[in-house]
């Protein structure tokens, strides 16, 4: 039995499939655990030794639907609803 390149050609079973949380092909089928995000754990997998990877997923890398409007709203006193005040000349 050889142990080098030739034995790699015999591999045809999938160990990982797509993770439903992070979308990467890192979900281990037998372990039922994602090696990328740690699913089904409640907290997302992240370590300090991979600071670059943390930055790729951190706040500010996505759409920021709520946060990108918050600063403008805060400057105006977090007003909501109501009609605009009429200007009197």
Swiss-Prot record:
It holds the Pfam family Ribosomal_L37e. Zn(2+) binds at residues 19, 22, 34, 37. Binds 1 zinc ion per subunit. Its cofactor is Zn(2+). One of its GO terms (biological process) is cytoplasmic translation. One of its GO terms (molecular function) is structural constituent of ribosome. A zinc finger (C4-type) spans 19-37. Transmembrane segments: none annotated. One of its GO terms (cellular component) is cytosolic large ribosomal subunit. Keywords: Metal-binding, Ribonucleoprotein, Ribosomal protein, RNA-binding, rRNA-binding, Zinc, Zinc-finger. Belongs to the eukaryotic ribosomal protein eL37 family. Binds to the 23S rRNA. This is Large ribosomal subunit protein L37-2. It comes from Drosophila melanogaster (Fruit fly).
